[in-house]
Amino acid sequence: MTSFSLTFTSPLLPSSSTKPKRSVLVAAAQTTAPAESTASVDADRLEPRVELKDGFFILKEKFRKGINPQEKVKIEREPMKLFMENGIEELAKKSMEELDSEKSSKDDIDVRLKWLGLFHRRKHQYGKFMMRLKLPNGVTTSAQTRYLASVIRKYGEDGCADVTTRQNWQIRGVVLPDVPEILKGLASVGLTSLQSGMDNVRNPVGNPIAGIDPEEIVDTRPYTNLLSQFITANSQGNPDFTNLPRKWNVCVVGTHDLYEHPHINDLAYMPANKDGRFGFNLLVGGFFSPKRCEEAIPLDAWVPADDVLPLCKAVLEAYRDLGTRGNRQKTRMMWLIDELGVEGFRTEVEKRMPNGKLERGSSEDLVNKQWERRDYFGVNPQKQEGLSFVGLHVPVGRLQADDMDELARLADTYGSGELRLTVEQNIIIPNVETSKTEALLQEPFLKNRFSPEPSILMKGLVACTGSQFCGQAIIETKLRALKVTEEVERLVSVPRPIRMHWTGCPNTCGQVQVADIGFMGCLTRGEEGKPVEGADVYVGGRIGSDSHIGEIYKKGVRVTELVPLVAEILIKEFGAVPREREENED
């Protein structure tokens, strides 16, 4: 079993003399478990389903009946051995035809390489891979950005990068023979792609303006860095958590704005005081899937800041040990919570804490429920006197190599050589001397696509990869999202920012359920009765302290008919005014 530990100093308690001055206490009901929190569970059900063997956790023989195909692949060969025992070196020497000729190596390509952050695009880009990184809190450097640009540049039209909805980079066009050198290159600039896909902990999310935010509750960077280092054992691979039943998301909240979207994470740390100590209340179980979407619920538990890591470890161990491994649509952590009951799940977590104890939730939440979410675009003052951060719009999160090089240059020229990625697929340049902001705004790069002042509908636009690169996507998303939004903006004037999210399939990587208006790709019938690209339209998703998952507004809308429908929704639900009427009134 991996031996790994880190310690750090807890932040100062927020007090009457420290920021944020606008924080208020919220009701205790938000941090205590609901009444229906217990379930009748047979003692045999609490037997761990995995065991440690040869340094890795594997599913016990007695629990293998009815398991899903992915679990069988994991049993046949531990995926992390491709990295930890240099299996990737051997794979990289073979042609795709050779690899496809044997089941074991074909499973390596299509399944196990995801543990190294490599996703084969068999359907649309045979032999090409998407590589997902680990980028805790979305913080990256100009050197890292330049290196990634150098990687994708060599792949021509197939090479590009995306900012993801978890503050992360994904690069495209990668071919297998290049992977060993790319992994070395990533390590040389302080990056890793390990344990970023499949049944692993995904990128830890935090406040994108952590440490520079004048109104932050706590700087989330020490916590997200700690979590990422623990999960990957300092980028060496942590076999304790490479065999989860399904993917698992975590975030640390540091702001009243809830940029971190805690309600859709498996584990969310919510800042709270208790008896004069700073720490976190815990939300658990939030997730999206094709068959079910759930908001995270209170665990009725609080941990001091120093126990962020032990708590994460305990939750992961409970999920790893007890989670079901049958139908993949029923293996996310909330299904286990349903089965055990909130209190039963809490007990299992408590058992796995270092001292076997877990404090009850605190009523002293530090997140202000009445807070109006701030916009981070444009020039904004930092908590550090004389410095500002500048938020830039990245249309649907897509960048080319030249774009990344230019961002790196701007970060070096005007800032501190650092960039911040956001869950809305945008980028922030921090630590800009306020005296230099005007010169930055005059840069040609900011005059076109990467504007610090995007239009009111563009600024809230998010889109997944879509069918251009993803084999699971039913429709093209990124270009269509831009086109539909441009056409809608010509039809109506909107009084406030509206968040519109696009996802190409029911896996909802584009997180349509949290959007004001969401579009989920589907096939529908055309005028001649033949299948055509369409979208199920969602309305009513909310983020922030009154977070809520949106609901279906209309199913199976042809993509060619979306523009008038969106304009209609904006007028009926969001106070938009037709452009023609606005011009007449003017």
From Swiss-Prot:
**Pfam families given in the database record:** NIR_SIR, NIR_SIR_ferr
Cross-link Glycyl lysine isopeptide (Lys-Gly) (interchain with G-Cter in ubiquitin) maps to which residues of the chain?
A: K103
Question: Ranges of Low complexity compositional bias?
Answer: 1-18
Task: Please tell me where siroheme binds in this chain.
Answer: C509
A GO molecular function term, named singly, is: 4 iron, 4 sulfur cluster binding
**Induction / repression:** By nitrate and by light.
Recorded metabolic or biological pathway in which this protein acts? Nitrogen metabolism; nitrate reduction (assimilation)
Q: Where is the transit peptide?
A: 1-25
Which InterPro entries does this UniProt record tie to the protein?
Answer: NIR_SIR_4Fe-4S (IPR051329), NiRdtase/SiRdtase_haem-b_fer (IPR005117), Nit/Sulf_reduc_fer-like_dom_sf (IPR036136), NO2/SO3_Rdtase_4Fe4S_dom (IPR006067), NO2/SO3_Rdtase_4Fe4S_sf (IPR045854), NO2/SO3_Rdtase_FeS/sirohaem_BS (IPR006066)
Its GO CC terms?
apoplast; chloroplast; chloroplast stroma; mitochondrion
Reactions performed catalytically:
6 oxidized [2Fe-2S]-[ferredoxin] + NH4(+) + 2 H2O = nitrite + 6 reduced [2Fe-2S]-[ferredoxin] + 8 H(+)
Name the principal localization, coarsely classed: plastid
Q: Which UniProt keywords apply?
A: 4Fe-4S, Chloroplast, Electron transport, Heme, Iron, Iron-sulfur, Isopeptide bond, Metal-binding, Nitrate assimilation, Oxidoreductase, Plastid, Repeat, Transit peptide, Transport, Ubl conjugation
Q: How is the cofactor bound?
A: Binds 1 siroheme per subunit.
Where in the cell does this protein reside?
Plastid, Chloroplast
Disordered, as annotated region: 1-20
According to its UniProt record, this protein's enzyme class is oxidoreductase
Q: What is its EC number?
A: 1.7.7.1
Q: Which family is it part of?
A: Belongs to the nitrite and sulfite reductase 4Fe-4S domain family.
Give the quaternary structure: Monomer.
The job of this chain, per UniProt, is described as: Catalyzes the six-electron reduction of nitrite to ammonium.
Q: What is this protein called?
A: Ferredoxin--nitrite reductase, chloroplastic
